[in-house]
Swiss-Prot record:
The gene is murA. Cell wall formation. Adds enolpyruvyl to UDP-N-acetylglucosamine. Disulfide bonds: none annotated. It comes from the Bacteria. CDD domains: UdpNAET. It comes from Dichelobacter nodosus (strain VCS1703A). SUPFAM superfamilies: EPT/RTPC-like. Its main location: cytoplasm. InterPro entries: Enolpyruvate_Tfrase_dom, Enolpyruvate_Tfrase_sf, MurA_subfamily, RNA3'P_cycl/enolpyr_Trfase_a/b, UDP_GlcNAc_COvinyl_MurA. PANTHER family: UDP-N-ACETYLGLUCOSAMINE 1-CARBOXYVINYLTRANSFERASE. It is an enzyme of class 2 (transferase). This is UDP-N-acetylglucosamine 1-carboxyvinyltransferase. The keyword Cell wall biogenesis/degradation applies.
Length: 419
């Protein structure tokens, strides 16, 4: 199994190019199931989750593959097997996104209950509620969601809770339904808007994009399109925090600062100087950093996917701070690993309090989920001495060539085989 070996204490500086957003690419890949013909998607990161979903599409009968470094082609003309099997999707919760498209185009779907990060309950009840509201019969049997519908019908419905993948699944199902669907309490995340724009490029009729109420007028069929996904705001934030903890100065290119304003504001509160451009963000860190308290919430508030990275920052910042996690339970599994590195950190319920220390010490640590792995990389960059991070397959699920990008900024980091 592979590990990352990091020698801390190196200042990060230079420029780095941001990859396409995993959380935008995955639903758009699922949406290609709605179309007969070949759809081409640009700015696709080469990630484990992306490869898994391509394998799922191919298993169904599609022809899905990379045609260039960051370009994917999907021809879903001849889907013969509308099933997402457990063997393929057990590592990825986004697999449930094929439910809506399969049901809309083929009238049936069988999707294994999703796996992915071990960060508490991520229920699919809102997905099931949405499909039933559109007229589908849905059962959960032996670990699979099985759905059937002769024809989906437009409906007005309200999500009980804000859910990104739930919104996306209902959106994809509704575009081919009879009549108009009005979806209230829809997620506002930029990745949801990106999917909606892609669907409209395929011929869908979606209004209210970027608001909490989406109106979808069903159409008879969609057509292929050529679409470029938005940049990864979480990768952008992660690399900016990595630069901050090393007292660094970097420019993140091909990104969109308006997508992560809540993160940039917290970096400024920590003492960093931030410059925003149309397609770049520049950060210059001023030490000592100041600890920042924050509370995760749906977009446009502070994203849960940046919580762990800021916890690493707070561990080496001046003062104490509290981080409150409101989105997912059990998303503090990186705390014991930070403690191994010398962090002063305490959990009470859904709140973590940190008391900054002068320096962390390198240690062998283990990643437990995608963002926890990023947190440990950041902590290792700030630490004194060598850190070896195990289970970095979590990192590879969501970050494209992370060690290559960090090495380009001056980090001493290498991928090694576990002894």
């Amino acid at each position: 199994m592979e590990q990352l070996k990091i020698m801390g204490g190196r200042r990060l500086e230079g420029e780095v190019t941001i990859s396409g957003a995993k959380n935008a690419v995955l639903p758009i890949l699922a949406a290609t199931l709605l179309v007969k013909g070949t759809t081409v998607i640009d700015n696709v990161p080469r990630l484990r989750d992306v490869n898994t979903l391509l394998a799922v599409l191919n298993e169904m009968g599609a022809k899905a593959h990379f045609t260039a470094e960051n370009q994917v082609s999907v021809d879903a003309s001849n889907i013969t097997n509308p099933v997402a099997p457990y063997e393929l999707v057990r590592t990825m919760r986004a697999s449930v996104l094929v439910l809506g498209p399969l049901l809309a185009r083929f009238g049936q779907a069988k999707v294994s209950l999703p796996g992915g990060c071990a960060i508490g309950a991520r229920p699919v009840d809102q997905h099931i509620k949405g499909m039933r509201a559109l007229g589908a019969e849905v059962d959960v049997c032996e670990g699979y969601i099985e759905a059937k519908a002769s024809r989906l019908r437009g409906q007005t419905l309200t999500m009980d809770v804000v859910t990104v993948t739930g919104t996306e699944n209902i959106l994809m199902a509704a575009v081919l339904a009879d009549g108009t669907t009005v979806l209230h309490n829809a997620a506002l995340e930029p990745e949801v808007s990106d999917l909606a724009h892609c669907l409209n490029a395929m011929g869908a009729k979606i209004k209210g994009i970027g608001t909490s109420t989406l109106t979808i007028e069903g159409v008879e069929s969609l057509h292929p399109c050529h679409y470029r996904t938005l940049p990864d705001r979480i990768e952008t934030g992660t690399l900016l925090v990595a630069a901050a903890v090393t007292g660094g100065s970097i420019v993140a290119r091909q990104t969109s600062p308006q997508l992560l304003e809540a993160v940039l504001e917290k970096l400024e509160a920590a003492g960093c100087s931030i410059r925003r451009g149309a397609d770049f963000v520049a950060l210059e860190a001023k030490k000592p950093l100041q600890a920042v308290s924050l509370r995760t919430a749906p977009f446009p508030a502070f994203p849960t996917d940046m919580q762990a990275q800021f916890m690493a920052l707070n561990c080496v910042a001046h003062g104490s701070a509290a981080i409150v996690e409101t989105i997912f339970e059990n998303r503090f599994m990186h705390v014991p690993e930070l403690s191994r590195m010398g962090a002063r950190i305490f959990i009470e319920g859904n709140t973590v309090t940190t008391f900054g220390v002068e320096k962390l010490s390198g240690a062998p640590v283990m990643a437990t989920d995608l963002r926890a792995s990023a947190c440990l990389v950041i902590a290792a960059l700030a630490a004194e001495g060598e850190t070896v991070i195990s289970r970095i397959y979590h990192l590879d699920r969501g970050y494209e060539a992370m060690e290559v990008k960090l090495r380009g900024l001056g980090a001493q980091i290498e991928r090694i085989q576990e002894a």
